[in-house]
Amino acid sequence: MQNIDLICVGKLNAPYFAAGVAEYQKRLGAFCNFRIIELPEAAIADKSASDAQISKALDKEATAILSSLRKGEYLAALCVEGKQFSSEELAKLIADRANSGAGDIAFVIGSSHGLADSVKKSRQRKSCPMGRITMPHQLARLVLTEQIYRACTINNGMKYHK
C-alpha cells in the first residue's frame, strides 16, 4: 500500500478543521497509509521581524521537514510558485508514483512565512499551489486532505468525484 504523508508546520488548533481532517484521514485508510506529521513553527520574536530573522526561522523549519521525509520519498511542496493542477492531475501524480515502484509521496505545507528554498529544491518534483487565493494554513490542511481523498477515489473509479 502506498505511503502518503502530509507534513505540516504548525498546529491544527480549530476543532472544526481538526474534525474534517480526521474524517478524511479515516477515509484515506482504505486507499493508502496516510499519516500527518505536525512540526512546530519556529518562534519569531516579534511581528516586525526582519527578513534575516524570518529566513533563519524558515531554515530551522526546513531542517525538521527534510528530516521527516522517508528515504526516496517524492516531495510536493505547497507554494505559490508552482503550476496549478486539477483534481484529476493530482490523482495522476499519486497514481504515477504508486505505479513507479517508489510510491511514497509527501505533501508539505509550510508555516505562515512559507517554505525555505532548501525544501523547495530538495527532492522536489512539484510545486503545488492551492490556487491564487490566500487561506489560513489550517484550512489548507483540510482542503489538501480532502483533495488527496478525492484523488484516491478517482484512481479507484469511485463516484465521489463528479
Feature names for model-found ranges:
Residues 1-28:
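N-terminal beta1-alpha1 ligand-phosphate binding loop
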Residues 3, 103-108:
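Loop/turn-to-beta-strand initiation segments
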Residues 7, 35-37:
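General small-molecule cofactor/ligand-binding pocket signal
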Residues 12, 80-83, 111-114:
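Short glycine-rich anion-binding loops that position phosphate/pyrophosphate groups of nucleotides
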Residues 29-35, 73:
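A generic structural motif
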Residues 36, 75-77, 125-127:
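Conserved beta-strand scaffold positions in the cores of enzyme catalytic domains, especially
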Residues 40-105:
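S-adenosyl-L-methionine/SAH cofactor-binding core of RNA-modifying enzymes
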Residues 117-162:
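Structured adenosyl-cofactor binding patch, chiefly the S-adenosyl-L-methionine
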